[in-house]
Regions:
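N-terminal secretory signal peptides that target proteins for export/translocation
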Residues: 1-16
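N-terminal targeting/docking segments
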Residues: 13-14, 21, 191, 198
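Beta-propeller domains with acidic blade repeats across secreted/periplasmic ectodomains
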Residues: 37-242
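Sec/Tat signal peptide C-region and signal peptidase I cleavage site
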Residues: 32-36
């Protein structure tokens, strides 16, 4: 006798069987068929140079990600993408490792953006529109409330404009912008203690969570498209043409 038959006999003794007893088996069989019908991941290993033992598969199709100018994880491991004008939270409802749907949680971020995203506590910071935008209510799971722009205006959406946001080990939010981001003199610097006194071309800024205190920590580059940080808090970037 099979395990499934033993379980069936336990929950549905012979004297109580009938149509009701037959239904759970039908539902279980249907669920099994659904699992069998799931689409297998599409591997694209041949399009990349990978270390031995590593694989890459397509996590989501374009209908879920949109234009996808940026991608991050929030503190719970959920995926956010910028879809050219808004922020989408991708959803894997059947938990098969493929994200087939999404929910728009923030809007009004202009064209070709957002190109910088960061979830920090209950807030979402996004680079789009006229600069760094603050949205609140992230932990509610619903659409977020736009609190407005933080700091002075930045140009966004361009290759040489404002880009990546990072959370530093010191609790500050870090932003990198290219030489087309609108940096000049002390346009964005608010603090006398700023390590860099004047903004010049591409720069890295840091600001507090409220977005009221701004400092410049690096300047003089050309067009860094992104910004990385290692476990020591050191920053890394590159020029887009070098």
């Amino acid at each position: 006798m099979t395990i499934s038959k033993l379980i069936y006999n336990y929950f549905y003794p012979r004297k109580k069987r009938g149509f009701v007893g037959f239904l759970p088996l039908f539902l279980c069989h249907f669920a099994f068929e659904q699992v069998q019908a799931e689409v297998a991941p599409v591997y694209v290993d041949d399009q990349f140079e990978l270390p031995s033992g590593f694989h890459i598969y397509k996590l989501a199709e374009n209908n879920a990600t949109g234009g996808s100018y940026d991608i991050i994880f929030d503190g719970q491991g959920r995926i956010l993408v910028g879809d050219t004008t808004s922020v989408r939270r991708l959803e894997d409802k059947d938990e098969d490792g493929i994200y087939e749907s999404y929910k728009v949680i923030a809007t009004g971020l202009g064209g070709r953006g957002p190109q910088g995203l960061l979830v920090y506590g209950d807030n979402l910071y996004a680079v789009g529109g006229d600069g760094v935008q603050l949205y609140s209510g992230y932990e509610s799971g619903d659409a977020l409330k736009h609190q407005g722009r933080l700091g002075a205006r930045f140009n966004t959406g361009g290759d040489h404009a404002a880009h990546t946001l990072l959370r530093g080990f010191d609790g500050y939010v870090y932003l990198v912008t290219g030489d087309g981001g609108g940096v000049k003199d002390r346009t964005h610097i608010t603090e006398e203690t700023s390590p860099v006194l004047f903004e010049r071309a591409a720069s890295v800024f840091r600001f507090d969570q409220s977005g009221t205190r701004w400092e410049c920590v690096s300047t003089g580059s050309r067009n860094p498209p992104s910004l990385g940080m290692n476990y020591l808090g050191e920053f890394f970037s590159m020029d887009s043409d070098m």
